[in-house]
């Protein structure tokens, strides 16, 4: 695995861990807050029930203090008052009942009468208290409020309704669990199982006088919590994979672009990045181009210099290709007859012709000095090379006809580069000996 791949993998892993940890942490905190909100909803529900029970007691006391009614008159007055101000239907299942030491009267009409059961179960009839009462296969929370020294009102609320009302006030109620235990036995709420619950909170609630005594248990459904966390982790993994792939793509593009720029500069193809690249501005490229020319190129012809030739020749046996040595025929006579300015034009023209014919990825032109040149060709066949070299066997500068003599040798013909140079040089002189203006490759 490359260093880049390791780096991208590390970044992706960090992204995955960070998103998973942060998102799951936030979700966990939300779940815990919802569990505590359910606890508060139970307290608020009990408080609301107690307040309405207290309101109904105050109605009865006002009637007694104002009218000093008989039992029958008090009952009629309560029914009338409650009819004028009906309590919310979601709070009460049955009642209230007016009870004394030896009598129980149903205040609301047209309901099932539980007086006999109440008289049998409720022991403290003249002391304010709350608790549980069960009859007819149902369990109720009861609130008992004295209205006179020997009469009290008792209000009943079904535990199932109490539980539903409490959960309805909390967020995400369908995934919350609420159970109430009395003497170690479940009284109401969800079927609590520790294996299926998470973030369990339990409290006796003894310090709340308006709550029935018991153990209140609040929790969140474990399977829902784990399912959401799994989705979060999957999403984090997806984001990490996409981020990693994008990062790897961008890094590889940057590196590939850098490689292209490096090779363009190293191989003297500055035109590819002259307009500015990823790592080098146009000004940087021009400076590098100038430095490169000074170090590696012939100032006059812009052919590669002797240093580059020696380096490329060493690599030729491994790559496989041709070495061509040539010079301009009777170049001294040209200089003596027409002057050095024309001589320079001749040298530049030879290099220009070859550069226009040789693809940049297949060969290079070198100048050793004077009219001595070389070509290293690695990208094609002998026929292709001969076709290129024929362009300089005969050529013109202005109206002057000129020619070159060329010797060609292949790297497979010689065991060393020194012998390869000697063979190409021998064939160059063979071309001159045979009348110049020709190519010798055998």
Swiss-Prot record:
Subcellular location: Cell membrane
GO molecular function: diguanylate cyclase activity; GTP binding; metal ion binding
InterPro entries per UniProt: Diguanylate_Cyclase, GAPES2, GGDEF_dom, Nucleotide_cyclase, Rev_trsase/Diguanyl_cyclase
Positions with a binding annotation for substrate: 335, 340, 344
Enzyme Commission designation: 2.7.7.65
Reactions that this protein is recorded to catalyse: 2 GTP = 3',3'-c-di-GMP + 2 diphosphate
Xref: Pfam families: GAPES2, GGDEF
Gene3D superfamilies named in the record: 3.30.70.270
Protein's UniProt keywords contain Cell division: no
UniProt keyword annotations, A-Z: Cell membrane, GTP-binding, Lipoprotein, Magnesium, Membrane, Metal-binding, Nucleotide-binding, Palmitate, Signal, Transferase, Transmembrane, Transmembrane helix
Keyword set includes Cell membrane: yes
Signal peptide bounds: 1-23
Annotated binding of Mg(2+), by residue: 327, 371
Cofactor binding summary note: Binds 1 Mg(2+) ion per monomer.
Superkingdom of origin: Bacteria
GO biological process, one term: negative regulation of bacterial-type flagellum-dependent cell motility
Lipid positions (S-diacylglycerol cysteine): 24
Cofactor(s) this protein requires: Mg(2+)
NCBIfam families referenced in this protein's UniProt entry, alphabetically: GGDEF
Main function: Catalyzes the synthesis of cyclic-di-GMP (c-di-GMP) via the condensation of 2 GTP molecules.
Stated name of the protein: Probable diguanylate cyclase DgcI
Species name: Escherichia coli (strain K12)
């Amino acid at each position: 695995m490359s260093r880049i791949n390791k780096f991208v993998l590390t970044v992706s892993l960090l992204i995955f861990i960070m998103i998973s940890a942060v998102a799951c942490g936030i979700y966990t905190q939300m779940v815990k807050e919802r569990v505590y909100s359910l606890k508060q909803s139970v307290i608020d529900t009990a408080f609301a029930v107690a307040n309405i029970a207290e309101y109904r007691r105050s109605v009865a006391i006002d009637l007694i203090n104002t009218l000093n009614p008989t039992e029958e008159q008090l009952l009629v007055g309560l029914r009338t008052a409650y009819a004028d101000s009906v309590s919310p239907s979601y709070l009460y299942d049955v009642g209230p009942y007016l009870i004394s030491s030896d009598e129980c009267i149903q205040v609301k009409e047209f309901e099932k009468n539980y007086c006999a059961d109440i008289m049998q179960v409720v022991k403290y009839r003249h002391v304010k208290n709350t608790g549980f009462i069960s009859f007819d296969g149902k369990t109720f929370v009861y609130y008992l409020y004295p209205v006179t020294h020997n009469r009290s009102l008792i209000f009943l609320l079904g535990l199932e309704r109490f539980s539903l009302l409490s959960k309805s006030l909390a967020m995400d109620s369908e995934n919350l669990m609420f159970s109430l235990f009395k003497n170690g036995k479940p009284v109401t709420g969800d079927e609590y199982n520790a294996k299926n619950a998470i973030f369990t909170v339990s409290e006796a609630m003894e310090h709340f006088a308006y709550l029935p005594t018991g153990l209140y248990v609040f929790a969140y459904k474990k399977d829902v919590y784990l399912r959401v966390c799994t989705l979060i982790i999957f999403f984090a993994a997806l984001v990490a994979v996409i981020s990693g792939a994008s990062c790897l793509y961008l890094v590889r593009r940057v590196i590939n672009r850098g490689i292209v720029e490096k090779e363009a500069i190293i191989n003297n193809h500055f035109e590819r990045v002259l307009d500015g690249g990823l790592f080098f501005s146009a000004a940087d490229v021009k400076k590098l181009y100038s430095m490169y020319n000074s170090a590696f190129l012939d100032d006059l012809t812009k052919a590669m210099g002797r240093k580059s030739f020696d380096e490329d020749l060493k690599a030729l046996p491994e790559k496989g290709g041709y070495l061509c040595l040539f010079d301009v025929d009777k170049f001294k006579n040209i200089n003596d007859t027409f002057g050095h300015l024309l001589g320079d034009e001749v040298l530049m023209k030879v290099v220009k012709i070859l550069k226009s014919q040789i693809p940049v990825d297949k060969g290079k032109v070198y100048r050793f000095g004077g009219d001595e040149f070389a070509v290293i060709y690695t990208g094609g066949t002998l026929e292709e090379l001969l076709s290129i070299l024929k362009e300089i066997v005969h050529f013109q500068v202005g109206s002057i006809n000129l020619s070159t003599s060329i010797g060609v040798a292949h790297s497979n013909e010689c065991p060393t580069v020194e012998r390869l140079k000697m063979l190409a040089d021998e064939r160059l002189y063979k071309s001159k000996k045979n009348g110049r203006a020709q190519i010798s490759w055998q």
